[in-house]
From Swiss-Prot:
A molecular-function term among this protein's GO annotations: protein dimerization activity
Biochemical pathway: Amino-acid biosynthesis; L-lysine biosynthesis via DAP pathway; (S)-tetrahydrodipicolinate from L-aspartate: step 2/4; Amino-acid biosynthesis; L-methionine biosynthesis via de novo pathway; L-homoserine from L-aspartate: step 2/3; Amino-acid biosynthesis; L-threonine biosynthesis; L-threonine from L-aspartate: step 2/5
Protein name: Aspartate-semialdehyde dehydrogenase
Binding positions for phosphate per the UniProt entry: 102, 244
Subunit text: Homodimer.
Catalytically driven reaction(s): L-aspartate 4-semialdehyde + phosphate + NADP(+) = 4-phospho-L-aspartate + NADPH + H(+)
HAMAP family: ASADH (MF_02121)
Name of the gene encoding the protein in the UniProt record: asd
Record keyword NADP present: yes
Protein function: Catalyzes the NADPH-dependent formation of L-aspartate-semialdehyde (L-ASA) by the reductive dephosphorylation of L-aspartyl-4-phosphate.
C-alpha cells in the first residue's frame, strides 16, 4: 500500500504528523510518500520511509500511483486536483481534512468513535472518499455522541464559543498580536495602582475602535471583543458554519433521511485552539441526570463527564485545561425550567485534534486494516 501525504506542513498537517509519530502509525504504512506544492525535489521529512524526495502535489500521474492519499492542503487544492485524478481512472482512497467533498453522496464524514459502523459499511460497499468533519460538529459529537447514538435527542441547539485556530494560523497570530497591542496601550497605567480603571477602559475601547488595532485577518477586533458570525452568509440569516451543524451531524450519524433538528449560533471568541459549546437539548424522554451522565460517559474513551459544580466546572471545562489534549469534557448537565426532557450541557475540545487531525489519523489506520 502506497500512502501519499499532501499538506503535511500546515497547521492541521503538522498536528497529524505529530500524532502519527506518537502512535507509531508509520510502522503500519508499507510505503509513505510526501508531496509538495512549492518544493518539488526537495528533501522529504524523515518518518523512516524509503522515499526521501518530495513529489509534485499537482502531478496527477504521480498522485495516481498512490493507493491512499491523505490531504490537509485545503479546499482549493481538493477542488483543483480531486476530479482530474478520479477522471484519470484512479480508484484509490482519498482522505481529506477540507470541507469540499463532505456533503457528496459518495463521501463519508469520518468520526469513528461515533460512526464506525458507517465507515465499515462504506469500506464494504466500495466508498473511497473519507472526509474529516467540521471541527465544531466533531467535537459536539465526541461529547454528546451517547445521546445521539441512542436516538434520545428530539432537537438540539448549540451556541458556540469558537477558537481563532478554526480560521487559520495567521488568525491565531493576530489574536495574540491584538492582546499584546491592547496591553501595550495601557501598560504604564496598569503598572500604576493609583490609575483609574475607567480611564484604562476608555483607552482600551478607543484602541479597539481605531485603525491601529491589528485586524487584517479577522477584519474586526477579536481580543477584548468577539465576532458573532463565522463563515459566509447563506442569505437566509444563517451562516454556513451554523448550517453545517445540522447537515453534517446527521450525515455522520447516517440519518440524513430522517434528520434530528440541530441549529444555533456560531461565535468566534479569543480562545487559541479550543472550541466550546453551550447546548440545549430536548430529549425524547425524561431521563434522570445520573442516567444521562452514564450514557454520555460510556460513549467513547475520550469524553469525560464533569460534575455540575462550580469548582469542577471552572477548572475542568475550559480551553486552558483542554488545549493540546484528546480529552473532550462535558459538564453543566442539568434539567432546565422548560421541563423534564430539556437539558443543558457545556463542552470543550481541541479544534486541531478531535476537531481536525485525529479523525483522519484514525480513518487512515482503519483503511489500512490496523484499527
Amino acid at each position: 500500500m502506497k500512502v501519499g501525504f499532501v499538506g503535511w506542513r500546515g497547521m492541521v498537517g503538522s498536528v497529524l504528523m505529530q500524532r502519527m509519530k506518537e502512535e507509531n502509525d508509520f510502522a503500519h504504512i508499507p510505503e509513505a510518500f510526501f508531496f509538495t506544492t512549492s518544493n518539488v525535489g526537495g528533501a522529504a521529512p524523515d518518518f523512516g520511509q524509503a522515499a526521501k524526495t518530495l513529489l509534485d502535489a499537482n502531478d496527477v500521474a504521480e498522485l495516481a500511483k498512490m493507493d491512499i492519499i491523505v490531504t490537509c492542503q485545503g479546499g482549493d487544492y481538493t477542488k483543483s486536483v480531486f476530479q482530474p485524478l478520479r477522471d484519470s481512472g484512479w480508484n484509490g482512497y482519498w482522505v481529506d481534512a477540507a470541507s469540499s467533498l463532505r456533503m457528496k453522496d459518495d463521501a463519508i464524514i469520518v468520526l469513528d468513535p461515533v460512526n464506525r459502523n458507517v465507515i465499515d459499511n462504506g469500506l464494504k460497499n466500495g466508498v473511497k472518499n473519507y472526509i474529516g468533519g467540521n471541527c465544531t460538529v466533531s467535537l459536539m459529537l465526541m461529547a454528546l455522541g451517547g445521546l445521539f447514538q441512542n436516538d434520545l435527542v428530539e432537537w438540539a441547539t448549540s451556541m458556540t464559543y469558537q477558537a481563532a485556530s478554526g480560521a487559520g494560523a495567521k488568525n491565531m497570530r493576530e489574536l495574540i498580536s491584538g492582546m499584546g497591542a491592547i496591553h501595550a496601550k495601557v501598560a504604564d497605567e496598569l503598572a500604576d495602582p493609583s490609575s483609574a480603571i475607567l480611564d484604562i477602559d476608555r483607552k482600551v475601547s478607543d484602541f479597539l475602535r481605531s485603525e491601529d488595532y491589528p485586524k487584517a485577518n479577522f477584519g474586526v477586533p477579536l481580543a477584548g471583543s468577539l465576532i458573532p458570525w463565522i463563515d459566509v452568509d447563506l442569505g437566509n440569516g444563517q451562516s454556513k458554519e451554523e448550517w453545517k451543524g445540522g447537515v453534517e451531524t446527521n450525515k455522520i450519524l447516517g440519518r440524513s433521511d430522517n434528520p434530528t433538528v440541530i441549529d444555533g449560533l456560531c461565535v468566534r471568541i479569543g480562545s487559541m485552539r479550543c472550541h466550546s459549546q453551550a447546548l440545549t437539548l430536548k430529549l425524547k424522554k425524561d431521563l434522570p441526570v445520573s442516567e444521562i451522565e452514564a450514557i454520555l460517559a460510556g460513549a467513547n474513551d475520550w469524553v469525560k463527564v464533569i460534575p455540575n459544580e462550580k469548582e469542577a466546572s471552572i477548572h475542568e471545562l475550559t480551553p486552558a485545561k483542554v488545549t493540546g489534549t484528546l480529552s473532550v469534557p462535558v459538564g453543566r448537565i442539568r434539567k432546565l425550567e422548560m421541563g423534564g426532557e430539556y437539558i443543558s450541557a457545556f463542552t470543550v475540545g481541541d479544534q486541531l485534534l478531535w476537531g481536525a487531525a485525529e479523525p483522519l489519523r484514525r480513518v487512515l489506520r482503519i483503511v489500512l486494516g490496523s484499527l
